[in-house]
Structure formats: C-alpha cells, structure tokens
C-alpha cells in the first residue's frame, strides 16, 4: 500500500496545505483501516492542530489499534477539548499501560499543554494523581506529580517535593 509513504511525505512537507490535505483525507474516511491509521499517524507527526475535531469524532473506535492511533494523535495535536476525552480513556484503561496507550496519551497531552493551558493542566493532573493513587498505579501518580511540578509556581514546588517525600508510598 502506498498510503503510508504518501501520508509520511505530506507530514514531512510540513506546509499548511499538506496538513489540510491530511485532514481532508481523514474526513473522507475512505480507504482501508490501514490507510486511515497512516493518515492519523502522519497528522500526529506533522502536528496538524486543525485535525483535533476530526480526531475527537474518531475517538472510541472498536479496533484497539485504531483507537491507539487516534489517542496518540490527540496527545500530539489536541488542545483543552481533548483533555476530558483522554482523561476518560485513561480511566477506562485503569491508569496503566494497555493496548490503546490511553494512559500514556493522556500524560503526554498534559505535559504538552503545561505551558499553554496551565490552569486546566494543574486541575487535570491533581485529579489524575488522586485517581491513580486510588487505582494503585504508582507510575501514573509519579507522572502526574512531575506534571504538577512543571506547572506549579517555583515558590510552591519545594512544598510539593517535601510532601511527596513524606508520602508513605515512596
């Protein structure tokens, strides 16, 4: 299939027109699932922000491999509209690694949005930290703490570090 090389060529081009072509291809939803996955991956690689709405519509795919591509792409191009969708996907995944990569995608999105949407990220990371603790997922809890430390004002970081050091699960 030539869909993979063609989609990667458009992604490598990096122009606005190339991004528009990828989004248009995804909107048409033509071709095989492999073709769609190739286009979704290219959108992620080219960081085509305009694709968020189309990707959100594709989220929830029955095919776990398609879902993985969509969630990965949302982690690369999504904005605050993607936060609740990826939060729910991470929750459904039990805040751990599994085939769709939902938890990893959510963490990656939070890390990417720290600078542009600090308040929403802080709120989401605090919620993630509590939920991960409840689920017994220490690695996700640690990732949420790293996000909080990156987002927090420097004056408050030392307090957070001291509190983390006193945590019984250290």
Residue ranges and their predicted role:
Residues 6, 36-39, 70, 102, ...:
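Conserved hydrophobic register position within alpha-solenoid helical repeats
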Residues 11, 27, 44, 75, ...:
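Structural signature of alpha-helical solenoid repeat scaffolds
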């Amino acid at each position: 299939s030539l869909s993979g090389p063609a989609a990667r060529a458009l992604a490598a081009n990096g122009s606005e027109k190339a991004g528009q072509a990828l989004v248009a291809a995804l909107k048409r939803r033509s071709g095989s699932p492999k073709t769609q996955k190739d286009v979704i991956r290219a959108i992620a690689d080219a960081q085509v922000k305009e694709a968020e709405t189309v990707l959100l519509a594709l989220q929830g795919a029955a095919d776990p491999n398609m879902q993985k591509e969509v969630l990965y792409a949302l982690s690369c191009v999504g904005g605050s509209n993607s936060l609740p969708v990826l939060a729910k996907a991470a929750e459904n995944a039990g805040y751990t690694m599994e085939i769709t990569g939902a938890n990893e995608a959510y963490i990656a999105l939070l890390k990417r949005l720290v600078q542009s949407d600090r308040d929403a990220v802080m709120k989401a990371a605090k919620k993630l930290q509590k939920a991960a603790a409840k689920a017994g997922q220490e690695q996700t809890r640690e990732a949420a703490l790293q996000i909080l430390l990156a987002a927090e004002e420097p004056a408050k970081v030392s307090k957070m570090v001291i509190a983390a050091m006193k945590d019984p699960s250290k």
